[in-house]
């Protein structure tokens, strides 16, 4: 499949053939599995204290005796804490068990649980190829919410030469992505408790820019535009190509990065 090739002035200078990675069958199930695996690698372990709900001085004899026993009292044989007493007469309540007030939880989350999900190497590569193939389907790109009416992905020659945020914005405007930029610049304040849990604002995902080599100035310039991401072509993953496990992200890739995909046979 051929797509238009643009220069830094957003003028079409020819066509370019997409590498075989873009011809993969789109597997939504594999993409989701790879995405969830990446998300699990970021999950922080959590759990209750091992002694939570077990710190009361509560004990009841299970034998037939006269002192502190539950036999012959018409009460269940559970651990009990004495709140007050008069001789051998106790006012005591159940403690240290799941059904009791101030008791432990029956099956609390364990801090030692391993949340890390593994995925086969070939399966991960298949997911990346599937996500790349989805970027050339205009219907999937529009279904993600991107506003574009030209063939995708967008291939730009010399993309690595840009250094300033203003230059990147001008290129995107010349490529006809003015409405797309307006969409990602609109940031909404989240409804609900997420506001006080470190995710107060909802940020839309815009285009993904893929380059051949790392350049600090270029990467910082892209970071200044909300919703945009940038990555080197060997470091691509499903989370970047299909945020939320939904494939079809708008892809802007440099010509050199496309040739690197072809020559190095990445993700095969």
Curated annotation (Swiss-Prot):
Protein task: One of the primary rRNA binding proteins, this protein initially binds near the 5'-end of the 23S rRNA. It is important during the early stages of 50S assembly. It makes multiple contacts with different domains of the 23S rRNA in the assembled 50S subunit and ribosome.
Family of the protein in this entry: Belongs to the universal ribosomal protein uL4 family.
PANTHER family: 60S RIBOSOMAL PROTEIN L4
One Gene Ontology molecular-function label: rRNA binding
GO cellular component, one term: ribonucleoprotein complex
Listed InterPro entries: Ribosomal_uL4 (IPR002136), Ribosomal_uL4_dom_sf (IPR023574), Ribosomal_uL4_euk/arc_CS (IPR013000), Ribosomal_uL4_euk/arch (IPR045240), Ribosomall_uL4-arc (IPR019970)
Name of the molecule in the record: Large ribosomal subunit protein uL4
Pfam families on file: Ribosomal_L4 (PF00573)
Gene source species: Nanoarchaeum equitans (strain Kin4-M)
GO biological process, one term: translation
Binding partners and assembly: Part of the 50S ribosomal subunit.
Keywords: Ribonucleoprotein, Ribosomal protein, RNA-binding, rRNA-binding
Matching PROSITE patterns: RIBOSOMAL_L1E
């Amino acid at each position: 499949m051929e797509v238009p090739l643009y220069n830094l002035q957003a003028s079409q200078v020819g066509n370019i053939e997409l590498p075989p990675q873009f011809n993969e069958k789109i597997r939504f199930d594999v993409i989701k599995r790879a995405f969830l695996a990446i998300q699990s690698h970021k999950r922080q372990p959590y759990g209750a204290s091992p002694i939570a709900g077990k710190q009361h001085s509560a004990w009841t004899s299970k034998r037939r005796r006269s002192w502190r026993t539950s036999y012959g009292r018409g009460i269940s044989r559970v651990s009990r804490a004495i709140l007050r007493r008069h001789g051998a007469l106790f006012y005591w309540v159940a403690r240290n068990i799941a059904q009791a007030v101030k008791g432990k939880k029956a099956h609390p989350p364990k801090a030692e649980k391993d949340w890390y999900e593994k995925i086969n190497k070939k399966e991960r590569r298949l997911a990346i190829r599937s996500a790349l193939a989805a970027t050339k389907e205009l219907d999937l790109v529009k279904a993600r919410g991107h506003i574009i009416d030209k063939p995708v992905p967008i291939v730009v020659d010399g993309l690595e030469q840009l250094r300033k945020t203003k230059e990147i914005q001008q290129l995107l405007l010349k490529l006809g992505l003015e409405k797309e930029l307006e969409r990602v610049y609109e940031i909404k304040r989240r409804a609900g408790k997420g506001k006080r849990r470190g995710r107060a604002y909802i940020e839309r995902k815009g285009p993904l820019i893929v380059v051949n080599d790392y350049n600090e100035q270029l990467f910082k310039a892209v970071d200044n535009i909300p919703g945009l991401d940038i990555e080197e072509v060997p470091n691509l993953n499903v989370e970047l190509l299909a945020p939320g496990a939904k494939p079809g992200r708008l892809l802007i890739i440099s010509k050199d990065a496309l040739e690197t995909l072809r020559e190095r046979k990445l993700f095969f």
